[in-house]
Amino acid sequence: MTGKITTLLFDLDGTLINTNELIIKTFQVTFQEFMPDRVFTREDILPFIGPSLMETFREINPAHADEMRAFYREYNLKHHDDLILEYDGVYEAIRALYEEDYKLGIVSTKMYDTIMRGLKVTGLDKFFQVVIGLDQVSNAKPDPEGIEMALSLLNATKEEAIMIGDNYHDIEAGKNAETLTAGVAWAIKGPEHLAQFQPDFMLEKMSDLLAIVRDEE
């Protein structure tokens, strides 16, 4: 792919904001409520970060998947603002991209309202022109639907776009949409895990994006 990058699409959790402890704690409490006889360690829960809730709960406990999702969301929202953290340098890098007139969007497997809450808590909401949540698409990542919807709303093409994320769902979704892709080295599963999905770039820090988009010009 050649040409100028004008459009940057981001995953939210684990990419722009650190919700790892919130997610792990919420899963632990949910599993304790519905499956008290089974112990889920932190390592057991890591693979559940990234896929949609229903994908996870249907695999673990299909008979109670709907109830578990409702319980998870209630607990998650209640403790959301207390447990999310900012990643160093993210705000400054996103602000710089915004000020240089790049088109910025979010494509997440979270519900729209929850995405907006996280963005507002961290002050990032003012920088993103398009936000695509799970409740706005029929098919979650790695299906390209969310990316394609965001590109359409931003009046951008796949040739000028890059998808940035911390999970294989993000990289695969970008590849399926035929955009460039970037993994983040601060992913909770580690850069080695992401590297096996062969993103075009691996970011050591969010400001690395500035050099990437400028080099593409």
From Swiss-Prot:
Positions annotated as active site in the UniProt record: 11 (nucleophile)
Statement: the UniProt record of this protein carries the keyword Magnesium: yes
E.C. code: 3.6.1.1
Recorded catalytic activity of this chain's protein: diphosphate + H2O = 2 phosphate + H(+)
InterPro entries noted in UniProt: HAD-like_hydrolase_sf, HAD-like_sf, HAD-SF_hydro_IA, HAD_2, HAD_sf, PGP-like_dom2, Pyrophosphatase_Ppax
Molecular function terms, GO-annotated: inorganic diphosphate phosphatase activity; magnesium ion binding; phosphoglycolate phosphatase activity
Pfam families in the record: HAD_2
Entry GO terms, CC: cytosol
GO biological process, any: DNA repair
Keyword Methyltransferase belongs to the record: no
SUPFAM superfamilies given in the database record: HAD-like
Keywords from the named record: Hydrolase, Magnesium
Cofactor: Mg(2+)
Function: Hydrolyzes pyrophosphate formed during P-Ser-HPr dephosphorylation by HPrK/P. Might play a role in controlling the intracellular pyrophosphate pool.
Assigned protein family: Belongs to the HAD-like hydrolase superfamily. PpaX family.
Alphabetized PANTHER family for the sequence: PHOSPHOGLYCOLATE PHOSPHATASE, PYROPHOSPHATASE PPAX
HAMAP family reported for this sequence: Pyrophosphat_PpaX
Protein name, as recorded: Pyrophosphatase PpaX
Source organism: Listeria monocytogenes serotype 4b (strain CLIP80459)
Gene for this chain: ppaX
